[in-house]
Amino acid sequence: MTNNKNYMKFLKFYNKKNKIKKIKNCSYKKLFCMNHYLRTGSNKRKKFLKKQYISTISVKKRLKCAWPKLINCSNFIIKDKKNIPLIKSYPKINRTSIAPTPWVIDSIFSFLKKFFFKKQNSKILSKNKKKKYLEKWEIVGIIRRYVFLILILSQTSIATYKLNSILPYKDISWSYTIYLFNKNIFLIIKYFSPYILQIFVLILFYILFFWVSASFWTAFMGFYQLITKKDEYNISNKSIVKEIKKNHRTAILMPICNEDVERVFAGLRATYESILSTGKIKFFDIYILSDSYNTDICMSEQKSWIDLCSETGFIGNIFYRRRNRRVKQKSGNIDDFCRRWGKNYSYMVILDADSIMSGKCLVKLVSLMESNPRAGIIQSIPKASGMNTLYARYHQFSTRVYGPLFTAGMHFWQLGESHYWGHNAIIRIKPFIKYCVLSPLPGNGIFSGSILSHDFVEAALMRRAGWSVWIAYDIPGSYEEPPPNLLDELKRDRRWCHGNLMNFRLFFMNGLHPVHRVVFLTGVMSYLSAPLWFAFLILSTILQIIYNIEFMCCFKINSYFYIIPYLHLEASIGLFFITLLLLLLPKFFSVILIISKNSIQYGGTRCFILSIILEIFLSMMFSPIKMMFHTFFIFRAFFGFSLSWKSPKRRDFSTSWKESIKSHIVQVVIGLIWSFLIIFFMTIKSLFIFFPIIFSLIISPLISVYSSYVKIGLIFKNFGLLLIPEEKYPPKEIINTKKYFKINKNKSLKNGFFQAILHPVYNALAVAMASSRHNSSILIDLNRKKFLDLILIKGLNKLNMIEKLTVLNDPIILTKLHFIYLLNNQ
């Protein structure tokens, strides 16, 4: 950083006497002698040929220009076998042998056989085993789930029976069928097609109403739990160990891949300082586990890590490692940590790139693990906050208001057989290593290979092994950020959709707990419900058109309700409002809860109620668009379209008109065709039934663009609408994250790969953190020379991703390129 003038003078002087092609063949020692000449102006070369002296005065002196205190720490920089400087960015490896268990998946017939003959099978299996007694919470959970199922089935059956009584096609005239059979078989098809269509409508309605009913009863029991505060089986209410055992240490893992570096390290620093304030920092280590392959981001990560260590007062508990082989993506990154350092820790907390957790929350999770020795995973509930676009504000408001209701309800039905969401959760490492390492799904095609939505599967395997999985729904201090706009959320949804479809292959997995089979099923249904809703609406429209054509001469249908004969108007209105009530009651429960406690956090009662109305309106606008996209995702997956996953945006990015029109043009066309069919074949009044859906599809590009604007989001914020407690009374961790994010942006490293070659300090950092540390070999040296020739011919700008990573990983190539390119430029 300093003595740049001397540096340039030296380069200019040296360039006159030496050719560039000769420099690439210079030895590592000679180049560092040149570098020492730059710093000191000394020409006593023999003195600097000593190995130890050279490595100390070259890389270390350059690094001292930027991070003097940190570089002076003992054992921060060591030397490898070839005396090349090496920064100890991670601890000594303490390897554990881990291996994934091959999948044993039953066929449907063998699964049904085991299910129906469970008693006989259990008698055979338990001859030489001790009888397992169920814990109290397990018995209570079984009873609750049977009640849950009875409530849903009864409610759904009544609603379907009502719909059947409303639909027009009921009695089949068999005598007329025989008459038609003698005439023409096509007349029979024409006669029976409305009845077959109506059966499909009833089946779809039963499935979809079952889904709505399950959601309602989950919200209802969550409301009961939160309003009474009498949850005997809430894991966070149990007796908690006050002191953590000294040998029970926790690793906080942040797996990242090409993320927004400034935001990642801002959140990490806020989390670290929050732990520091609890006085329990000695029980925690932080690991940044990078899978990044963008070399600019890789270099920025290294700089941000060393900055973080320097700013927090380096005490040797913040580590950084970047993998060279990206096997199994995020789950493989965590497996790699467990293999290398899992022995050193009792627990690990997984964070996402946008996660923030308070020190109190982390200490509480560790204490819960200490108090519940059979708990394998405890999931905290991350609260969405931190974005300002209209869509993000809508998203974080709805999850903040309705989320507690549904998570408490899920806990009521699942208890210790719950699932985990892949981040902001604590995991017991030993059983995780033993039972939860995932092998790729067998076979070919897009539903085979590495599992994408690994979190649900890991929770299922943990429970299968006899360890409980809990949701700690009432622990504060866990945060994440929502997607900034609609299209970004849909990109994330596509990956989740694909992952849930892959997971469903494990539905018949041997030994899986019934609750986790249901979790896999609900995971699929959360996306499959979209095409089912779409099919239900389309078939209902077709059925109404057929009915209108057939009975146009008999009487005029004068109704606002589709597939409803005029004579059944009262029954249809009743069913319509019952369905609407089931959809809106969870929102009403949330309103009661918040107003009864403290609505000031949401801007006061008046602003809160207006925000609820606004949220309902926005949901009506966004839901049809999501329905169409989820339908496309399902079809794309089944037709074999591959999926490429990129890290989501972590800032308030708006959607461009070009991107919006390109993404939504299909929905616009479908909306226009749908409205034309209704107007042409039905009545204009019938259009009002479908109006919210069709109108949303037609104007979807406008919705997508305007909902991504920060200005519109801030206007609502200034009026006190869509406020959440984290905005009204922001916790210290969120305040610090925003503060450090601004600081990080001001000192962010741009064009990191070129800086690693050209800039003296960043080159020294890249050299000291390069991972390719091979012993001397003629073949390696020869390949290195060939690669340097290739770089000089192609130029840095034209190197591909793999070539750039090769450069960044090799300390000798980095050193030679540093001198070659600077001399060439001068």
UniProtKB/Swiss-Prot annotation:
SUPFAM superfamilies: Nucleotide-diphospho-sugar transferases. CDD domains: Glucan_BSP_MdoH. GO terms for molecular function: hexosyltransferase activity. Pfam families: Glycos_transf_2. It is a multi-pass membrane protein. The keyword Cell membrane applies. Gene3D superfamilies: Spore Coat Polysaccharide Biosynthesis Protein SpsA, Chain A (3.90.550.10). It is an enzyme of class 2 (transferase). Pathway: Glycan metabolism; osmoregulated periplasmic glucan (OPG) biosynthesis. One of its GO terms (cellular component) is plasma membrane. Keywords: Cell inner membrane, Cell membrane, Glycosyltransferase, Membrane, Transferase, Transmembrane, Transmembrane helix. It is found in: Cell inner membrane. Belongs to the glycosyltransferase 2 family. OpgH subfamily. This is Glucans biosynthesis glucosyltransferase H. It comes from Wigglesworthia glossinidia brevipalpis. The lineage of its organism: Bacteria, Pseudomonadati, Pseudomonadota, Gammaproteobacteria, Enterobacterales. The gene is mdoH.
